[in-house]
């Protein structure tokens, strides 16, 4: 794409009747990295602000005794607060991990609170259409990392619910957090391969656009850093992009200052692939915590019942504790997920300045 024409090529992101003036989704980041402060600020700029529901109520009173209740309360609170900050601009959504134990409750709370979009990954969201009626106003999207996964979820939704995705998020191998790839794939996948995967997914969804008589926008995620990356995604046929890591080093991000500084200080060689108790590889910053996990299992002192498939007696560490420690500012002894380009982040900015730089 000719960068001189870049601005004229940036179209609004239209998800049915819901419209974001800027085709940028701020990716959901948990625990507590993207809540109402960040999501509301992104929506206010005309983008799609996304709240992560993973242990979102970690700082609510009584969380240690009642995680489910605190999380439900916090989902409502943060969606409403983000919408207030947005002032009627952009869209406010949630990212809900399929691996969560209270997945259905998180979806229902998000719909009731008025989320515009529900994005769901860390597993295939097979039952999402059953939890979100077509008339409720919330739009649904699976996160997929392969054409195979896209075909599978679209086929299942069509067969089981006579319904299709409102949009699709394609998350590539350069993303942060949990990744839909094997360790081997992450070591050997070059960009050319993945561009082809994106093109195949775009072709695959065409069948369902025809069947259901509607456009299914595609949003590309993973390693999107600057205008050139956005232009490249649009050239491949995407309708928008999802960016997460870059929004961490903003004043509005909901993480502690120490967490944001860890991103600013990070170098390319500090990034590594780890195995998560969720059962997927993840990309994170190497620190004391990761070195300790490599040496020995970190016994789980308290189980937060956060994951559907987790045996606290066997997992290498408690992911809830590790992520909460990090978001609160203990950046050496907590888990800091990040995208592959975190080493390119050099300074603190604001959501407004970052979006101006990207558009």
Predicted regions and their residues:
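Residue-level detector of alpha-helix initiation sites
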Residues: 33, 224-225
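Active-site entrance/lid segments in N-terminal catalytic domains of soluble metabolic enzymes
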Residues: 2-211
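Conserved active-site-proximal phosphate/metal-binding subdomains
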Residues: 25, 175-219, 225-359
């Amino acid at each position: 794409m000719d960068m001189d024409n870049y601005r004229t090529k940036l179209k609004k992101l239209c998800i049915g009747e819901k419209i974001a003036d800027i085709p940028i989704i701020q990716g959901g980041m948990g625990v507590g990295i993207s809540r109402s402060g960040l999501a509301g600020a992104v929506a206010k700029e005309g983008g799609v602000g996304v709240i992560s529901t993973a242990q979102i109520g970690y700082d609510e009173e009584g969380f240690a005794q009642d995680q489910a209740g605190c999380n439900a309360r916090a989902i409502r609170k943060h969606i409403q607060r983000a919408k207030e900050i947005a002032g009627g601009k952009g869209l406010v959504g949630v990212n809900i991990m399929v691996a969560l134990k209270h997945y259905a409750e998180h979806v229902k709370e998000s719909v009731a609170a008025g989320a515009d979009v529900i994005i769901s990954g860390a597993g295939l969201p097979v039952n999402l259409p059953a939890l979100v009626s077509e008339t409720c106003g919330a739009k649904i999207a699976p996160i997929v990392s392969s054409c195979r996964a896209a075909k599978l979820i679209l086929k299942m939704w069509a067969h089981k619910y006579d319904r299709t995705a409102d949009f699709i998020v394609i998350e590539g191998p350069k993303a942060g957090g949990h990744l839909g790839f094997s360790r081997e794939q992450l070591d050997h996948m070059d960009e050319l391969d993945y561009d082809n995967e994106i093109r195949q997914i775009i072709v695959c969804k065409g069948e369902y656009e025809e069947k259901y008589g509607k456009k299914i926008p595609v949003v590309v995620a993973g390693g999107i850093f600057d205008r050139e990356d956005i232009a490249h995604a649009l050239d491949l046929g995407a309708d928008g992009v999802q960016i997460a890591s870059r929004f961490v080093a903003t004043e509005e991000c909901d993480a502690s200052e120490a967490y944001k500084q860890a991103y600013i200080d990070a170098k390319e060689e500090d990034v590594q692939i780890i195995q998560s108790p969720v059962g997927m590889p993840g990309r994170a910053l190497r620190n004391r915590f990761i070195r300790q996990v490599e040496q020995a299992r970190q016994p789980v002192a308290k189980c937060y019942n956060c994951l559907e498939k987790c045996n606290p007696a066997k997992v290498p560490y408690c992911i809830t504790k590790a992520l909460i420690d990090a978001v609160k500012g203990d950046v050496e002894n907590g888990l800091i997920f990040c995208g592959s380009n975190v080493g390119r982040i050099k300074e603190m900015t604001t959501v407004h300045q970052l979006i101006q730089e990207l558009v």
